[in-house]
C-alpha cells in the first residue's frame, strides 16, 4: 500500500494499469507521456476479480521496487484502462466478455483502497482515444474516433475535444453491429464487426479462410508478420477484415462526421495492408465525396498504445482540472 504522506510535494507521477483478459500491464509514467518502467504478465483464464486484484498488487510492488531503486518519486495517483462494460463515473465494471466471472465489480474503489491513492479509470477504447489525443495522431484534432480492437471492437469518441461516454459511462460497443448472417465471432456474435475486425476475430477469420495454412497454435502476431512479409493468404485475410471495418464505420461517419478515425492495436501494425481496404470500403459505403470523408490512419503510437492507454485517463483528469 502506498501512503499519501510519503509523496513529494508537487509531484505528478502515475502508476498506470492496462488490463484485459489476456494481459496485465503496469507502468510508471509522467503527465508528459514518458514511461520510465513497465512490467507485463499474462492473465489466467476464468479468473476471479479478487485474484486479478492480487495480481495487480504483486506486479505493482515489483514495478515500484524498480522505480525506487532509480530514486524516482512515489506515484501520487493511479490510472487504469480496463476492458469490458466499465462505467467511468461509478468505477464499476458491470460485465466483460473476457472476464466472464466478473459481475458488478467495484474496480475503482478497490484499487483506491489497496493503493491508498486517487484512481482515475476508463474503458480501454476511451483510454486509447485519450492517448491519441494527447500524444498520437489526434493531437490538434477536436473530433476523432479511436477504434479499440481488444477484446471486442469499441469506439472511443472525442467530440469538440470532449470525451464521450454513453449512458452506461463507457465506450461505444461498435462491434455488436452485424455485417453478415454468419462468419467469425471473436468474443462477439458470428458475423459481427467484432467477429471480423477485432484481434480475436481476425485470428478466427484466418483459420476460417485458410484452415490448412497455419498451425493450430499460431497467434495473431505471427499472421501479422506473415502479412508484412508478403504472404498473400495473410494479406487477403486482413484485407477482408479491413473491408468489413470500413463498412461498419459508415453509420458512425454519417452520424458524427469526425475529422479522423484511428485504428488501434494490433491493427495498426498492419499499416496500409489493413487501412487501405478499410478506406475503400468506407468510401463506398458512405458514398461521400473524398473531401467529406474523415482521414483513416493506423495509430502512429501503435506498439506504445498499451502503455500510454494506462496513464492517459489520469493525464486527462490533470489537464481538464487545470483548465477549469
Regions found by a protein language model. Give the residues of each.
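Active-site neighborhood for divalent-cation/phosphate handling
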Residues: 86, 108-139
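Hydrophobic "anchor" residues
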Residues: 34-35, 93, 163-164
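Short hydrophobic alpha-helix segments
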Residues: 38-41, 97, 167
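Glycine-rich phosphate-binding loop of actin/hexokinase-like ATP-binding domains
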Residues: 140-197
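A charged helix-plus-loop insertion that forms the helical arch/lid used to bind
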Residues: 93-100
Amino acid at each position: 500500500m502506498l501512503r499519501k504522506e510519503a509523496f513529494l510535494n508537487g509531484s505528478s507521477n502515475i502508476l498506470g494499469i492496462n488490463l484485459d483478459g489476456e494481459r496485465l500491464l503496469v507502468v510508471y509514467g509522467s503527465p508528459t507521456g514518458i514511461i520510465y518502467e513497465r512490467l507485463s504478465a499474462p492473465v489466467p483464464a476464468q479468473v476471479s476479480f479478487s485474484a486479478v486484484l492480487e495480481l495487480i498488487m504483486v506486479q505493482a510492488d515489483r514495478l515500484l521496487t524498480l522505480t525506487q531503486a532509480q530514486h524516482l518519486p512515489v506515484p501520487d495517483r493511479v490510472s487504469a484502462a480496463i476492458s469490458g462494460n466499465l462505467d467511468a463515473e461509478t468505477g464499476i465494471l458491470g460485465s466483460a466478455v473476457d472476464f466472464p466471472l466478473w459481475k458488478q465489480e467495484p474496480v475503482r474503489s478497490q484499487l483506491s483502497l489497496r493503493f491508498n491513492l486517487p484512481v482515475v479509470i476508463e474503458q480501454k477504447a476511451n483510454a486509447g482515444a485519450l492517448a491519441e489525443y494527447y500524444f498520437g495522431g489526434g493531437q490538434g484534432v477536436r473530433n476523432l474516433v479511436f477504434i479499440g480492437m481488444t477484446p471486442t471492437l469499441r469506439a472511443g469518441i472525442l467530440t469538440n475535444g470532449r470525451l464521450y461516454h454513453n449512458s452506461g459511462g463507457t465506450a461505444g460497443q461498435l462491434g455488436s453491429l452485424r455485417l453478415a448472417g454468419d462468419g467469425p465471432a471473436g468474443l462477439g456474435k458470428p458475423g459481427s464487426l467484432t467477429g471480423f475486425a477485432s484481434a480475436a476475430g481476425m485470428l478466427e477469420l484466418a483459420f476460417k479462410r485458410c484452415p490448412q495454412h497455419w498451425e493450430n497454435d499460431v497467434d495473431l502476431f505471427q499472421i501479422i508478420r506473415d502479412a508484412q512479409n508478403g504472404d498473400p493468404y495473410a494479406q487477403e485475410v486482413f484485407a477482408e477484415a479491413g473491408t468489413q471495418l470500413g463498412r461498419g464505420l459508415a453509420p458512425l461517419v454519417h452520424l458524427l462526421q469526425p475529422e479522423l478515425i484511428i485504428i488501434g492495436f494490433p491493427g495498426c501494425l498492419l499499416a496500409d495492408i489493413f487501412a487501405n481496404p478499410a478506406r475503400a470500403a468506407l468510401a463506398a459505403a458512405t458514398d461521400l465525396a473524398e473531401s467529406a470523408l474523415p482521414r483513416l490512419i493506423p495509430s502512429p503510437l501503435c506498439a506504445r498504445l498499451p502503455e500510454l492507454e494506462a496513464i492517459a485517463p489520469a493525464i486527462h483528469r490533470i489537464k481538464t482540472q487545470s483548465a477549469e
